[in-house]
Curated annotation (Swiss-Prot):
InterPro entries: Pec_lyase, Pectin_lyas_fold, Pectin_lyase_fold/virulence, PEL
Gene: pel2
Family statement drawn from the similarity comment of this UniProt entry: Belongs to the polysaccharide lyase 1 family. PLADES subfamily.
Known pathway: Glycan metabolism; pectin degradation; 2-dehydro-3-deoxy-D-gluconate from pectin: step 2/5
Keywords tagged on the record: Calcium, Disulfide bond, Lyase, Metal-binding, Secreted, Signal
Pfam families: Pectate_lyase_4 (PF00544)
Cofactor(s) this protein cannot do without: Ca(2+)
Name of the protein: Pectate lyase 2
Organism: Pectobacterium atrosepticum (strain SCRI 1043 / ATCC BAA-672) (Erwinia carotovora subsp. atroseptica)
Cofactor note (record): Binds 1 Ca(2+) ion per subunit.
């Protein structure tokens, strides 16, 4: 396998771009990801090296296991798995039955950041379980294997205070025969569930994904606060997210090419959908596949402001036979509560015009501000 090693300048630029305390995530997360005094910095070229570094951080200098981790970690990943990604792209329907590959961050609360270098890539996921204060940035995840084993790109289970920022996650928005719903392709891009809360998902480029992400694993897993901002979603089918209860604040995202449904607000969840750009989208805001506990939404300052805009932006609606509510009148159905963090959204037009310069990998963690919209 060929590894692409970063230059010293590239590594320094990425580290300089990450603030000493990354508490302002633009959302509910306030994590510093271990970027504190006493943090240990390591470099890894492979999935196994990341795993080994994390396991070593769970014991002290005497070899005694320390609950929550012995010290904060900052792991720079510079491996390259483009060959695995390209092979998977040629055998899309064969990925489902393969073994899932992933780094599991389990029961680690001391603080950890995984930071990809420019040019790195991964055919494995990052699975955060019973942990907190975790940051994943500048990672390029492609064509995850092991859909039958829940092989998500990023999974957050029972883990508060997580920041998923400036990553690229991609596969093929495609259906393979093999199950009753022909769903044997890939698992989710970002699933947040099992009591996880105070999570920010920002500046990611997510494309070619059939099931983008869950907010909640079941109808009883409903209590969470999530923020999605400055993400680009292209050629995706559904779950943007599939929201089971809780609060979702989504602002300054670009949705282009939704082939199934977008926001699916269920189980009395509340969504604030603010200053986003929608185009070429089927059912961009809806509540469906639920019994009767439909969620509500507040629509604020998006490019679509009224039904007359639907044809302009190619917004269309489907009406399933089961109970549902569509935002096909583009009116608010609820009121979002006060927001606990500071944020400064740009206009939806600026999102359309400029966000591609900032979202995804190899952008040196740059952010879009009003000054960039001029």
């Amino acid at each position: 396998m060929k590894y692409l090693l970063p230059t010293a300048a590239t590594g320094l630029l990425l580290l300089a771009a990450q603030p000493a305390v990354a508490a302002n995530t633009g959302g509910y997360a306030t994590t510093d990801g271990g970027e504190t005094s006493g943090a240990v910095k390591k470099t890894a070229r492979s999935l196994q090296e990341i795993v080994d570094i994390i396991e070593a951080a769970k014991v002290d200098s005497k070899g005694k296991k320390v609950k929550g981790g012995a010290y904060p970690l900052i792991i720079t990943y510079n491996g390259n798995e483009d060959s695995l990604i390209k092979a998977a792209e040629k055998n899309i329907c064969g990925q489902w039955s393969k073994d899932a590959r992933g780094v599991q961050i389990k029961e680690f609360t001391k603080g950890i950041t995984i930071l990809g270098t420019n040019g790195s890539s991964a055919n494995f996921g990052v699975w955060i379980v019973n942990s907190s204060d975790v940051v994943v940035r500048n990672m390029r995840f492609g064509y995850m294997p092991g859909g039958a084993q829940d092989g998500d790109a990023i999974r957050v289970d029972n883990s508060p205070n997580v920041w998923i920022d400036h990553n690229e996650i991609f596969a093929k928005n495609f259906e393979c025969k093999g199950t009753p719903d022909n769903d044997t392709t890939f698992e989710s891009a970002v699933d947040i569930k099992k009591g996880s809360t105070n999570v920010t998902v920002s500046y990611n480029y997510i494309h070619g994904i059939k099931k983008v992400g869950l907010s909640g694993a079941s109808n009883t897993d409903t209590g969470r606060n999530l923020t999605y901002h400055h993400n680009i979603y292209r050629d995706v089918n559904s779950r943007l997210p599939l929201q089971r209860g809780g609060l979702v604040h989504a602002y300054n995202n670009l949705y282009d090419g939704i082939t199934g449904s977008g926001f699916n607000v269920r189980q009395k969840g509340i969504a604030l959908i603010e200053s986003n750009w929608f185009e070429n989208a089927l059912n961009p805001v809806t509540a469906r596949n639920d019994s009767s506990n439909f969620g509500t939404w507040e629509l604020r300052n998006n490019n679509v402001t009224k039904p007359a805009d639907f044809s302009k932006y190619n917004i269309t609606w489907g009406r399933p036979s089961t109970p549902h509510v569509n935002a096909d009148d583009w009116k608010n159905t609820g009121k979002f509560p006060s927001i606990s963090y500071k944020y400064s959204p740009v206009s939806a037009q600026c999102v359309k015009d400029k966000l591609a310069n900032y979202a995804g990998v190899s952008k040196n963690l740059a952010v879009l501000t009003a000054a960039n919209c001029k």
